[in-house]
Amino acid sequence: MSNFIHQQSAHCESGVMSSLLTHHGLPMSEPMAFGLSAALSFALIPFVKLSGLPLIAYRMPPRAIVKGLQKSTGVTMQFQTFRDASRGMDALDAMLDQGRVVGLQTSVFWLPYFPEGMRFHFNAHNLIVYGREGDDYLISDPVFETPMRCDRASLMKARFAKGALAAKGLMYFPEKIPSDIDYAKHIPLAIRRNIKIMTKAPLPFIGIRGIRRMGQQLLKLERDAAQREHYLPLYLGHIVRMQEEIGTGGAGFRFIYAAFLRESSKLLDSAKLKEAATAMTEAGDHWRLFALRASKMCKG
């Protein structure tokens, strides 16, 4: 078994990468992992439906943090997927027998340590496996305060669940890690990449244009008496559910990015980044206030 130290975090993928890199000798906070990967985003995707309503996302797609950190830090990650579930579990066992710590992409629905009310069919939940005892795998799930255990059958189901974003048993781990990071170079580059994502995306439902588009839709629904009574509460409830219940949410990701800007302001001695961190925190506050007021409207 490795000497891995569990860390709770705000979001699964950024938390996993923070823990993996720190464990392998490159200390990195979760906000820094999130910020360097340029993962902040917004998307209102009309052609992907959940219960007849458009998919809303507040960050870049799954695996974007893992891949983004490779670009920003020089870390080389090894990725493995499997057609056969048994072979995928055997490969995991072989890594653990070598004392390796690995990240997995899983389905929340099949993880038995999740309370029943928190389980849903979401196939992009990231966690770390750092050992095993008998039939149990020792899990560092970033969203939990303490390490967890998961039996082999359940973990196999979680890794090989079918459907959207199916992981196909995805297992990943660092192969090459630099001794340090040139923050003065990579922080500004990552911020510029994120600005481009939010302000210059070619599609009208991505970034700031996507946020405005959603706002315009809400105003249009509010002006239509029939839609205001029936569809608007459903849409508001959907937005809040996507924002606050599924994953870290709109406000949560803004708070993480604000923490990245604050940490960066200290590393680079930048008053502008400190000011930007305050503005981003305020943006998160507004998203949370919106969710609160929308919830009250849904309840009447």
Role assignments for model-derived ranges:
Residues 6-7, 119, 240-247:
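Short, charged/polar micro-motifs that form catalytic or ligand-binding hotspots
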Residues 22-31, 261-268:
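Short helix-capping/linker segments at secondary-structure and domain boundaries
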Residues 241-300:
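Charged, long alpha-helical assembly modules
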Residues 1-28, 38-179:
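Conserved active-site-adjacent core of cysteine acyl-enzyme catalytic domains
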